[in-house]
């Protein structure tokens, strides 16, 4: 017997209701109460990084990576909402896809990933 998927991602928040609203409005991620977020977009990576990684801020223990269909469209929407978005062509590759990074209102790092076709 083995694990066959992620059952949930749980994290602390100063204002859980405001954070749920932010994720819903800006990323389309809906998580309310104990109703699971249904996704059918593909596999999920689970990967530990070294404690000295500079892939995300060192004052945070984790970073969420969300798969997106149209990175340019979402980046435009986020910037229109005055959300700082960082992109770097060095992060992108034809084999893996394209990336952008943002932070939620509580400073949690979020990576947005448009997989390669």
Positions of PLM-derived features:
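Short amphipathic alpha-helices within nucleic acid-binding modules
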Residues: 22, 72-77
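Amphipathic alpha-helical segments
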Residues: 15-30
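Helix N-cap motif at beta-to-alpha junctions
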Residues: 14-16, 69-71
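Short amphipathic alpha-helical segments
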Residues: 5-7, 60-64
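Conserved short beta-strand elements that form part of the metal-binding/catalytic scaffold
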Residues: 27-62, 102-105, 109-115
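Vicinal oxygen chelate
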Residues: 1-5, 11, 32, 75-117
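Short hydrophobic/aromatic beta-strand micro-patches
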Residues: 10-12, 65-67
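Secondary-structure boundary/capping motif
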Residues: 18-19, 63, 99
């Amino acid at each position: 017997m083995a694990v066959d998927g992620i059952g949930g991602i749980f994290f602390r928040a100063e204002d859980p209701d405001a954070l749920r609203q932010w994720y819903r409005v800006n990323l389309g991620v809906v998580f309310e109460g104990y109703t699971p977020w249904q996704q059918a977009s593909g596999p999920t990576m689970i990967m530990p990084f070294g404690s000295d990684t500079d892939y995300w801020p060192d004052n945070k223990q984790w970073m969420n990576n969300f798969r997106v269909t149209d990175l340019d469209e979402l980046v435009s929407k986020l910037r229109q909402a005055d959300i700082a978005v960082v992109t770097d062509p060095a992060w992108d590759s034809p084999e893996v896809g394209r990336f952008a990074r943002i932070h939620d209102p509580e400073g949690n790092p979020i990576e947005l990933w448009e997989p390669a076709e």
